[in-house]
Amino acid sequence: MKRQLIIGVMGGGTAAQTDVDSAYKLGALVAENNWILLNGGRNAGIMEASAKGAIKNGGLTIGILPDATNTNTSEYIQIPILTGMGNARNCINILSSNVIVACPGGAGTISEIALALKNQKHVICMNFDIGTIFDKYKEFIHHTKKPENAIEIIKSLTAI
């Protein structure tokens, strides 16, 4: 039996409204493709928006949370995984995802990109300029400005 794709959507807990809107649309498109959306599970920013987009469009969401309690968990996360691991949970986010979409964020998002590339996972940077620091891994890095294009890249990478 073929497993469903798990799309990791990484990004900041604080984000510009345009990035929140794009994350919502991305979540909706992930759901429409019958993929599972995985993110950091928080009730803010990119995490909240992408999960909301997926749920509102019939998707399944998994949140890998840094805490040992549900205090800051998004209401749009159906399967919260409480780790109590803090930022170390980023390893679970990345290793559990088939493809990563990195939305604007901070050091946490950069660490997730680094972990993904180190593990030879493809990263789609959506409206997120990561500069040249990861040029060594350019075969795994893809850039787009639109959620629809991110979906097309995922399909081409996974031969769907």
Regions found by a protein language model. Give the residues of each.
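Glycine-rich beta-alpha loop segments
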Residues: 1-62
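Hydrophobic beta-strand segments of well-ordered beta-sheets in folded domains
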Residues: 5-7, 121-124
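Flexible, glycine-rich phosphate/dinucleotide-binding loops
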Residues: 16, 70-71, 132, 150
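Acidic/glycine-enriched connector segments
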Residues: 21, 41-115, 119, 127-130
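Generic hydrophobic alpha-helical segments
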Residues: 23-26, 89-90, 150, 154
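Acidic, glycine-centered active-site loop in nucleotide-sugar glycosyltransferases
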Residues: 136-140
